Amino acid sequence: MAELPQSRINERNITSEMRESFLDYAMSVIVARALPDVRDGLKPVHRRILYGLNEQGMTPDKSYKKSARIVGDVMGKYHPHGDLSIYEAMVRMAQDFSYRYPLVDGQGNFGSMDGDGAAAMRYTEARMTKITLELLRDINKDTIDFIDNYDGNEREPSVLPARFPNLLANGASGIAVGMATNIPPHNLTELINGVLSLSKNPDISIAELMEDIEGPDFPTAGLILGKSGIRRAYETGRGSIQMRSRAVIEERGGGRQRIVVTEIPFQVNKARMIEKIAELVRDKKIDGITDLRDETSLRTGVRVVIDVRKDANASVILNNLYKQTPLQTSFGVNMIALVNGRPKLINLKEALVHYLEHQKTVVRRRTQYNLRKAKDRAHILEGLRIALDHIDEIISTIRESDTDKVAMKSLQQRFKLSEKQAQAILDMRLRRLTGLERDKIEAEYNELLNYISELETILADEEVLLQLVRDELTEIRDRFGDDRRTEIQLGGFEDLEDEDLIPEEQIVITLSHNNYIKRLPVSTYRAQNRGGRGVQGMNTLEEDFVSQLVTLSTHDHVLFFTNKGRVYKLKGYEVPELSRQSKGIPVVNAIELENDEVISTMIAVKDLESEDNFLVFATKRGVVKRSALSNFSRINRNGKIAISFREDDELIAVRLTSGQEDILIGTSHASLIRFPESTLRPLGRTATGVKGITLREGDEVVGLDVAHANSVDEVLVVTENGYGKRTPVNDYRLSNRGGKGIKTATITERNGNVVCITTVTGEEDLMIVTNAGVIIRLDVADISQNGRAAQGVRLIRLGDDQFVSTVAKVKEDAEDETNEDEQSTSTVSEDGTEQQREAVVNDETPGNAIHTEVIDSEENDEDGRIEVRQDFMDRVEEDIQQSSDEDEE
């Protein structure tokens, strides 16, 4: 291999070479490719495209020209890079969803909001828009500097005159080396108003500027949430602006709703947004959506329709879509632009100041250019006036000259004319020697003198020049200004949670034996006197019945503890609200239960982070455990282990405690043990627990509750055959944990085994639920108080094969008292005896009739009322059985 001549070898340290070369490359990218100029808001490629369009005469009043022709001309003369990069830049300037004020008028397929690419450049055509002319206006009047192109054969503008603030009007985005810019678009009317205010008050604050410029105005419209992000971006040049789609909830008949999206955030790909929603629905991360379709068209504009299931809350679904999809996103503002050829982070005021200074420079240079041209013309006219005053001598001198040069020299010497004046006289046509032409020259000369005076005044007085800038900006505002598209909504949207959209109200959540769940307003159930038939609380399936019921607020948490010792969590409003007769939805649609897993206890909790509360667990085999409530604050959708136990055991109940309670554990054979909660050491969430009660053969735990020391509460015992009683808590002595307990009721064939042992104050209502789905709500105070060994009194009359499945306490409220007053009234008979009138109702369910009857009895004759009521119940059951037989036939 031949060696290179020594003179062509330049040894350099590789570290220095890499550093300098990379810096050169970085500056080239920053200055010549990625960042816009603060004055015209354009990158070099955009500036070259617009200048190329102007040079080719592709104005709005001319016909479209092929995009390939435009790209080729720009690439050959000004931008020696790939044709694709030039075409993509031109396409973006033509998209009305990318530019607030498009600078290219495209004809053909220039892409869509779904991310579809534009057609090939050989198919599309383009020309300038009307507003683009304002960027280029006066470019040929020495208003800006021109520089050599890449090969030195052409001249190109270093910046455009930009008669409107394009940097903020259309925004900019670009990634350079070590820095990036992202400037949002704005409303032209607001921007020019801001520039006008700045020109009148150079010390104006950004807060005052924001009175004119409310915030970004995106071409896709949509919403901006709050002004804090806008204010931060305008003050510092950096900030995050929350953008949200415009969506409305429409009724579509049959109690169903749909969500209709008509505007989406800026730079969001609509097709990908729809795919994201579909993915969340498919992965069951968002529930309640039945259909999703894109109905966007040229006639309707953007229209994405989301159909919502009948039992779902459209507001909650929409809020979740905002959180998990591009329906709501942010725009990261980073206002970096080239200032005097160097990248700089600028705020709103600085951007407007630099633009205003640029406009003053443009107007000043244009004025100077016009002044030069006016003076040159006046100089020529002065020569013509001299020639007209001495026309005979001028003609004689010209006739006596042998050549043009001799004639010009003779005119200059004889009449003291300049070379330009002499040449103008020689070029003058004979027809201008008429009197009419002389008058025209005089008029033009006088007008020029006035015009020159005006131009000199503009240059001499900065305020006059500034007023001219204002007038021209006002003219552009009046011609191209429009209403803002993006609405700025004020409020705490950044912290919006689902419950902010849900009214807080008391509700009842029921769970059936076959694991169907639903919620109802607590007022659905009417208070009735003891022995009432009850209200049909749900239309149960065959062999299904309500097994559990809790009352809570829609904003409270519900903890679901299963027989397998796992815990799940929902908000009250997340359980679908259905009609009273509805069976509910499968609980697996709300909670991801494992196989053979059923809910054993539902607990309503307002604050899961509380350090003062505990959960006490009891299993069928008599094991108990105490654990801090805060251990259960973070429960995911798949649930977590709440307690560990042996395979032959299962969780019976869980209670919320304050840490200073007495624990009551009751069994099906009517044994009850009471011991202090403090004897239970708090254990971890997954711990096993300790022995709470020693069970006799065939016995098992059926109830767990708590009571205060020296409590005036009572123990309520309800048996499977509908009997119950109240016994003071203090009748049950404290004992050591792990004992056999003491007798709490006499169990016979008449009343059956115990199904519920709980504590009451006498101020609650009691809901008793049967396996037939019948719910009775009665006042606990109406239940007789008996000793520990008593069997109790009848609380509800049961039909054949019916038994009490569950019992729940609910708080009395004003609405309940009103309903109770409507159901029970007192009257005075003819003999002066006060009569009790009670309406007993078997409420309407599919296939059943409504049975009502007024029962009259003396006030203290409770046994008489029960006897009449039981007779009524028998007749109701006969009617129901007859109706059932007719249905079978």
From Swiss-Prot:
Q: Where in the cell is it found?
A: Cytoplasm
Sequence motif: GyrA-box, positions: 528-534
The keyword ATP-binding is assigned to this record: yes
Main EC class the enzyme belongs to? isomerase
The record's listing under Pfam families reads: DNA_gyraseA_C, DNA_topoisoIV
Where does the Topo IIA-type catalytic domain lie? Answer: 35-501
Q: Where is the composition biased (Acidic residues)?
A: 813-823, 876-889
Catalytic residues, per the record, are 123
Q: How the protein assembles, per its UniProt entry? A: Heterotetramer, composed of two GyrA and two GyrB chains. In the heterotetramer, GyrA contains the active site tyrosine that forms a transient covalent intermediate with DNA, while GyrB binds cofactors and catalyzes ATP hydrolysis.
Its recorded name reads DNA gyrase subunit A
Encoding gene (name): gyrA
